[in-house]
Amino acid sequence: MRLMRAGLDVDVVTDPHIMKMRAALVDKDCLVIGISLSGKTKEVLDCLHVAKKSNAKVVLLTSNIEPGVDKFCDEILRVAYVKNLDFGMKVSPQLSILIMFDILYAYYMEREASAKIQKYKDTISALREK
């Protein structure tokens, strides 16, 4: 949502079939970011593979780099993961992913900041209009 408010055309897709269809429709001007803490989520890896075949830039956020993923990922961003946190008793295992997205967002907003801030203000104004 924050990237959309900054003027980017963003889709967040979790359905495996839609992920593959969207990946087939991207092109060289697109960036596809896949998230799999285990690095083994077949649906995510398949989607990234299809996106790479479509000439998109491909990034994987993971805590575990599986052999071969570097063949279809332009960048692999490792995030922290503590074993057994997936039961939700302490800190969410997704916390490191949220932090990484905050870092990426801050970096993106810092470059050509005035234009992006204006787009952000425009989108907020559009939401407030009745």
Model-derived features: positions:
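A short, charged, Gly/Pro-tolerant segment at domain boundaries
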Residues: 112-130
